[in-house]
UniProtKB/Swiss-Prot annotation:
Top-rank lineage group of the source organism: Bacteria
Taxonomic lineage: Bacteria, Pseudomonadati, Pseudomonadota, Alphaproteobacteria, Hyphomicrobiales
Family under the similarity heading: Belongs to the P-Pant transferase superfamily. AcpS family.
UniProt-recorded name of the protein: Holo-[acyl-carrier-protein] synthase
GO biological process, one term: fatty acid biosynthetic process
């Protein structure tokens, strides 16, 4: 059963401008250590580096929309992080207020599945999130 759907599109150049203006302060405030490590592996290609951050920013926005809260009501940027499952498929790892919100949406006897797709085509990045409840067992 689908609990929430969210999508977001962002201009990568906007993220680039914010990073140029605020640097590490912005990156540390918004992105998890795992997300930062993923972006830093692309540091030799500036467009790929900033696109990595932009896609993850869009994923956080889309996830917050799917949770039905936006970035408020105890759901903060670093409570949501893009991670890859062993097969490479991206998903969201939730902690803190985002995890509390997700758990409040789940019917008894169900577990959450978060499907995520992220893409970019300069100068645009996009993310789409579907949060589903699956019966346990």
């Amino acid at each position: 059963m689908i609990l929430g759907i969210g999508s977001d599109t962002i201009d990568i150049r906007r993220v680039q401008e914010v990073i140029e203006r605020h640097g590490a302060r912005f990156i540390d405030r918004i992105f998890t250590e795992a997300e930062q490590a993923k972006a830093e592996r692309r540091a030799k290609a500036p467009r790929a580096w900033v696109a990595t951050y932009a896609k993850r920013f869009a994923a956080k926005e889309a996830c917050a929309k799917a949770l039905g809260t936006g970035i408020r009501q105890g759901v903060w940027w670093r409570d949501m992080g893009v991670v890859n499952l062993p097969g490479g498929r991206p998903t969201m790892q939730l902690t803190g207020g985002a995890l509390v919100r997700l758990e409040s949406l789940l019917p008894p006897g169900h577990e959450a599945r978060i499907d995520l797709t992220i893409t970019d085509d300069w100068p645009t990045a996009q993310a789409f999130v579907i949060i589903s409840a699956l019966p346990r067992g």
